[in-house]
């Protein structure tokens, strides 16, 4: 979606990876290290202007992203595709720009998105692994039945009012979510829970996973689970799964801006197949 060459102000889209361990989330906060603030400061240094970037989603403190999208505007002669290398040469090692391109003025990282997909990773091997520890919840206390977890996920497909899975402090005016995919799979010692929806409530996936683990080990029945979310019994949703297991996997748009190897297959192989 190229912009007119007569307009010196450009809108640039970015595909961003980050390791969330040492960030207080995506959104800029006073006196805190956040992904948005670090990228904004880096771009501002390059162009000599104060820059604001807009992300497709706001990940919480400690949550990772394999394919976050964002955009910013600036007055610069730098071609859109060159921004990836320019920023990667200046950004800290826990942020990586996988791709950049120029887009039209009506393209918006948040409002043009049709869906977001999150993956939660649980590592069930009894022995801790330092190379996996930062990116997965090490849960080995009891066996987890992925078929029970999938049975709990399937009824969530479609549009539902999921206020039971919304943390306090949310600024959303409603809790309606259109869940397009909800899948649980096991690969070796890993259990992956993936949720795709048009949008997500504050803390939704981690609250949901906390209950799914209880279902997977037989502590909570499928009937009890459905009663909780269908009747919005938020007071019974007491545990939020650790942030480190959650990753914003990818974001979908009507027209892909980048080839699949840039925005789609972006998580480390060992988290997919081990």
Swiss-Prot record:
The keyword Isomerase applies. Disulfide bonds: none annotated. Its EC number is 5.4.99.12. Substrate binds at residue 118. Homodimer. Belongs to the tRNA pseudouridine synthase TruA family. This is tRNA pseudouridine synthase A. It comes from Picosynechococcus sp. (strain ATCC 27264 / PCC 7002 / PR-6) (Agmenellum quadruplicatum).
């Amino acid at each position: 979606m190229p912009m007119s060459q007569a307009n010196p102000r450009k809108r640039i889209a970015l595909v961003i990876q980050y390791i969330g361990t040492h960030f207080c989330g995506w959104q800029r906060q006073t006196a805190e290290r956040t992904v948005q603030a670090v990228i904004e400061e880096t771009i501002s240094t390059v162009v000599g202007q104060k820059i604001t970037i807009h992300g497709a989603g706001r990940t919480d403190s400690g949550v990772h992203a394999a394919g976050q999208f964002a955009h910013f505007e600036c007055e610069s002669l730098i071609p859109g595709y060159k921004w990836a290398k320019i920023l990667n040469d200046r950004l800290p090692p826990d942020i990586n720009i996988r791709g950049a391109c120029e887009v039209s003025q009506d393209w918006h990282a948040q409002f043009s998105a049709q869906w977001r997909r999150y993956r939660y990773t649980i590592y069930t091997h009894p022995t801790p692994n330092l190379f996996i520890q930062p990116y997965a919840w090490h849960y080995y206390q009891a066996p987890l039945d992925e078929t029970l977890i999938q049975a709990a996920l399937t009824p969530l497909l479609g549009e539902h009012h999921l206020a039971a899975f919304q943390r306090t402090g949310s600024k959303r005016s409603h809790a309606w979510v259109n869940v397009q995919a909800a899948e649980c799979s096991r690969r070796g010692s890993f259990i992956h829970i993936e949720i795709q929806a048009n949008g997500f409530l504050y803390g939704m996936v981690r609250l949901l996973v906390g209950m799914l683990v209880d279902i997977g080990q037989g502590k909570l029945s499928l009937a009890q689970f459905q009663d909780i979310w269908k009747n919005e019994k938020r007071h019974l949703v007491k545990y939020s799964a650790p942030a480190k297991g959650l990753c914003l996997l990818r974001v979908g748009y009507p027209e892909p801006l980048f080839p699949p190897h840039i925005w789609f297959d972006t998580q480390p192989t060992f988290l997919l197949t081990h």
